[in-house]
UniProtKB/Swiss-Prot annotation:
Chain intervals for the UniProt region annotation (Involved in Mg(2+) ion dislocation from EF-Tu): 80-83
InterPro entries: EF-Ts_dimer_sf, Transl_elong_EFTs/EF1B, Transl_elong_EFTs/EF1B_dimer, Transl_elong_Ts_CS, UBA-like_sf
Originating species: Protochlamydia amoebophila (strain UWE25)
Pfam families: EF_TS
SUPFAM superfamilies named in the record: Elongation factor Ts (EF-Ts), dimerisation domain, UBA-like
Record's subcellular location: Cytoplasm
Protein name: Elongation factor Ts
A molecular function (GO) term: translation elongation factor activity
The encoding gene: tsf
Length: 282
C-alpha cells in the first residue's frame, strides 16, 4: 500500500473539490492510487464536481457579513460572470460570509475543513462541492478575513461594481464613526492607495523611488538635487498613501484633514488605522 501523505490528500482535494477527510478515506481505500480514488469519488456521486474542479475561476464576487463582535469579508470565484449573477451563487456567498463571521476561523484551510453549521454532516468544503454540482461550474472560496469590533473602533464598508471591489476602513477613537469610515471607504474604492501612511512604506520602496528620482535629474548641484528628490518623494506619498491623499469629495482636504475636522466636532481623537481594498481576482 502506498503511503497516504498530506501532499497526496491535498492533491486529491485540489483535483476533486472534496473535503480533506473524504479524500483521505478515498486514498486509503484505493491504497494510495490517485486515479482509483478519483474513480471511487465519482461513483459516490461527486463526478460532476470532480470534472469541473480543474477549470479556471476568473470571475467572482466579494461579500461581507457581520454580527455584534465580528466583521467578515469573503471572496468567492466562479468561471463566468453569468453564474456570479445567479441567485444560487449569491446565496452561497452570503452563507459563506455569515459562516466566517459566526465562526471566526483561523485560516482559509481551517475554515474549509470545519463543519458547516447549517448542515453538520458536511464540511464547508463539501458544502462548496454540492454547489459546484448544482450550478455546474467550478466555484472556489479564494480568501476570507475577519475583523473584531471594539468600543473604540468604527468600521466602514463599501461595495463597488456589484461586489467586484470591496473596501473597508477602520477608525479608532470612537465606535460611532461608521459614516465617516464609509465615506473614506468610498474614496479608497476610487483612488486605490497602496499604503496607509509614509511610515508604512517599506524602506526598499522609498530607496527605489529616490534612486529613480535622482536618475531623472542630470547636472544639478547636490543641494538642488536633494530638494527635487524630496519634492518627488512627497508627491509619491501624496499619491500612494491614504492619509496624504486629497479627499475625492473635497480636494481642498487631505484624508488626515477630513478626520481632524471630525475629531474637533466630536471632541475625540480619531485616526484611520487600517484599510482594506479587495478587487476580485487580485
Amino acid at each position: 500500500m502506498a503511503a497516504v501523505t498530506p501532499a497526496l490528500i491535498k492533491e486529491l482535494r485540489e483535483r476533486t473539490g472534496v473535503g480533506m477527510g473524504k479524500c483521505k478515506e478515498a486514498l486509503e481505500e484505493a491504497n494510495g492510487d490517485m486515479e482509483l480514488a478519483i474513480a471511487n469519488l465519482r461513483k459516490a456521486g461527486m463526478a460532476s464536481a470532480v470534472k469541473k474542479e480543474g477549470r479556471e475561476t476568473k470571475e467572482g464576487m466579494i461579500g461581507t457579513a457581520e454580527n455584534e463582535k465580528t466583521i467578515a469579508i469573503v471572496e468567492v470565484n466562479a468561471e463566468t460572470d453569468f453564474v456570479v449573477k445567479n441567485e444560487r451563487f449569491k446565496e452561497f456567498l452570503e452563507n459563506i460570509a455569515r459562516e466566517v463571521a459566526n465562526t471566526n476561523p483561523s485560516s482559509l484551510d481551517a475554515f474549509l475543513q470545519q463543519k458547516y453549521s447549517k448542515e453538520s454532516s458536511l464540511t464547508v468544503d463539501q458544502y462548496r462541492a454540492t454547489i459546484v454540482q448544482t450550478i455546474g461550474e467550478n466555484i472556489q472560496i479564494k480568501r476570507i478575513m475577519t475583523l473584531q469590533k471594539s468600543p473604540e473602533r468604527s468600521f466602514g464598508i463599501y461595495s463597488h461594481l456589484g461586489g467586484k471591489i470591496v473596501t473597508m476602513v477602520e477608525i479608532t477613537g470612537s465606535n460611532q464613526e461608521e459614516a465617516l469610515a464609509k465615506d473614506i471607504a468610498m474614496h479608497i474604492a476610487a483612488t486605490a492607495p497602496d499604503y496607509l501612511s509614509p511610515e508604512k512604506i517599506p524602506q526598499e520602496i522609498i530607496t527605489s523611488e529616490k534612486d529613480i528620482a535622482k536618475g531623472q535629474i542630470q547636472g544639478k548641484p547636490a543641494n538642488i538635487v536633494d530638494k527635487i528628490v524630496e519634492g518627488k518623494i512627497n508627491a509619491f506619498y501624496d499619491t500612494n498613501c491614504l492619509v496624504r491623499q486629497k479627499y475625492i469629495k473635497d480636494d481642498s482636504l487631505s484624508i488626515t484633514d477630513l478626520v481632524n475636522q471630525r475629531s474637533k466636532v466630536v471632541g475625540k481623537e480619531l485616526a484611520v488605522t487600517n484599510f482594506i481594498r479587495w478587487n476580485v481576482g487580485q
